[in-house]
Regions:
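Hydrophobic alpha-helical transmembrane bundles of multi-pass membrane proteins
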Residues: 35-39, 47-557
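Intrinsically disordered, low-complexity, serine/threonine- and charge-rich segments
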Residues: 24, 29, 33-35, 60
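Acidic, Ser/Thr-interspersed intrinsically disordered low-complexity regions
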Residues: 19-23, 542
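Residue-identity detector for glycine
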Residues: 9, 33, 40-42
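Extended, low-complexity intrinsically disordered regions enriched in Pro/Ser/Thr
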Residues: 5-6, 10-11, 15-16
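Short linear motifs centered on serine/threonine within intrinsically disordered regions
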Residues: 7, 28, 38-39
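Aromatic (phenylalanine/tyrosine) cluster motif
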Residues: 17-19, 27-29, 47
Length: 557
């Protein structure tokens, strides 16, 4: 049996192998490690044994035809070295910017106590640590541990999911520190004032959370350079949206229902849709044997959900300065999460023949924290928080079970279903905040309400948001508050517009540049050395050379 194949770069260290069929079709696969190759019932003599690390042939049961091969990659393709170079260069640039922008004079308010144990500055390090460090620490647990373990649900992609989440959070945090400064300067809001404190870290953490959420849509489908490009571009646009809404429009969104959850999910979903290449590539994604979870991976993901449930109140109230409002925000967030947990367990069996689907529990249980993220500190009826939590869980569970499979038919694939579990609650959270803005004055007595001016209203809102407003000294009336509620409502669609446009741009850029996508989707062996890991479930993907598509896998796991 002759198959008239030619091999270019035949030595073991070659970076690329090229297969040429009788039909003069060429298919190239990035390669630095071992290849398993089989030609029907034939022998692998087309590749000299001393040039291939590991060669095996298929038996008759696994044979699909004489034009089929199995590609098995053990090591990272050389293209990914570009990622490590870019990553290192970025870190050097960050160090230079940090050294140029922040000097000892900028850090004066962070000096420690003197030798007598007295605080040198009135608002020094002691106050910073007491007020903010605990919440800052809890937010980091939520972002890196909570979302990290939550994204480990893919059975053969857990290592990479956690690593990409960690990398995305770190890059977005560092880059976000300076993009926030740049956008603030463009909008003429000098929010930094040359002083470095925990507030800047908290703002950058919100940026990191946005990027981590977006990465959930494309986990397992991109190469490392593509992940890095996506993170850089989204950081620029997410901080633009953050500064525009919170510092220019002055909306109330302390927990990031719009700036974090809605923006992150829409950007990630649009990026995933646009960056998907040809139809046969979408089929490869949907039919990949690695796409899915198993019992053990879901246990780790459930641990991530528990961490998110535990630390979600800290995330929602981190930007609130008034302690009474912060206390109210914690209570409302926690009650909403309790309601969403109940709603998830009660509603999931309706779509799964009376059985609870673990996917609904993993993601819907914290949807209550998202829907009240913007308004947790202005909700004065505790029962409303529980109702909102139950409703958010039911809506997200319903939409995910109904629409998920239907959207895949049209080419949309979302690895973590972030559109349903972050986007929908975030959108609803924006509407809920708009409604509760109309009740901002109910804590004031009748005399104060009758004598309100614009200054009083904006100062009251400013107390909640910890911002100082510009205002005109006109007599207050209900129309003014309605206008402010209208600004809140418009912020929802401004966020949608920026997220859709920027996600489309980033996805098109990846597609237009024709960057190499992941060779093996949803598989840790794409990036990690697993050759010595006997427990790793090798299941080589079968490729039909004539149709240039993957039609199965060698061994089911």
């Amino acid at each position: 049996m002759e198959n008239d194949k030619t091999v270019q770069g035949a030595n073991q260290s070659a970076n690329m192998y090229s297969y040429q069929e009788d039909q003069d079709q060429k298919y190239q696969f990035a390669q630095t490690g071992a290849i398993r190759r089989s030609l029907g019932e034939g022998n692998p003599s087309a590749f000299p044994e001393n040039q291939i690390n590991n060669i095996s042939s298929m038996n008759n049961e696994r044979a699909v035809g004489q034009n089929s091969i199995i590609i098995h990659i053990d090591q990272t393709p050389p293209l990914y070295w570009m990622f490590f170079v870019i990553f290192g260069i970025f870190q050097v640039i960050f160090i230079i910017l940090l050294g140029c922008y922040y000097s000892k004079d900028n850090l004066i308010n962070l000096e420690l106590d003197d030798e007598n144990g007295e605080d040198i500055n009135k608002n020094g390090a002691r106050d910073e640590i007491t007020k903010n460090y605990k919440i800052f620490q809890e937010i980091n647990v939520m972002i890196f541990l909570g979302f990290g373990f939550l994204r480990s649900f893919l059975k053969h992609h857990s290592w990479t999911s956690i690593a990409i989440t960690l990398m995305g959070g770190i890059v977005a945090f560092e880059f976000g520190l300076f993009t926030l400064i740049c956008w603030g300067a463009i909008f003429k809001r000098d929010w930094n004032n040359g002083i470095f404190n925990f507030q800047h870290f908290l703002d950058a953490n919100y940026c990191a959370a946005t990027i981590v959420i977006s990465l959930g849509a494309v986990l397992g489908k991109l190469s490392l350079p593509q992940y890095l490009v996506m993170i850089f571009l989204e950081t620029i646009f997410s901080t633009l949206n953050y500064v525009l809404l919170r510092q220019t429009m002055k909306i109330i969104d302390v927990g990031g229902a719009l700036t974090v959850h809605l923006f992150g999910s829409i950007f990630g979903g649009m990026f995933s849709l646009v960056s998907s290449i040809m139809k046969n590539e979408r089929e490869r994604i949907r039919n990949s044997p690695h796409l899915g979870s198993n019992y053990n991976s879901n246990i780790f993901a459930l641990f991530g959900t528990l961490l998110l449930i535990t630390y979600f109140p800290s995330f929602n109230v981190s930007l609130i300065k008034d302690y009474s409002d912060k206390f109210k925000g914690v209570i409302n967030t926690y009650l909403a999460i309790l309601g969403s947990i109940v709603g998830s367990f009660c509603f999931s069996p309706f779509f799964n023949k009376g059985k609870i689907r673990i996917k609904d529990i993993l993601n819907s249980c914290f949807s209550g924290g998202i829907i009240v993220a913007g308004s947790c500190h202005i909700i004065n009826q505790l029962w409303a928080s529980i109702i909102l939590g139950v409703g958010s869980a039911e809506i997200t569970t319903f939409l995910c079970n109904i629409l998920s499979d239907k959207l895949k038919v049209y080419g949309y694939h979302d690895t973590s279903d972030i559109i349903y579990y972050h986007g929908i609650p975030g959108f609803l959270g924006g509407i809920v905040t708009t409604i509760f803005v109309g009740n901002l004055l109910q804590d004031k007595n009748e005399t104060e309400r009758n004598n309100f001016t614009d200054k009083n209203v904006y100062d009251y809102i400013g107390t909640i948001m910890n911002y100082t407003f510009e205002y005109n000294n006109n007599t207050f009336n209900s129309t003014d508050l309605s206008k402010y509620a209208g600004i809140h409502f418009s912020a929802i669609f401004i966020t949608l517009a920026i997220a859709i446009a920027s996600g489309f741009f980033a996805g098109f850029l990846i597609k237009f540049c024709n960057c190499n996508f992941a060779i093996r989707y949803f598989n840790d062996s794409e990036y990690f050395d697993v050759t010595n890991n006997e427990s790793f479930p090798w299941d080589d993907e079968l490729i039909d050379v004539q149709s240039n598509s993957r039609i199965g896998n060698g061994e089911k796991n």
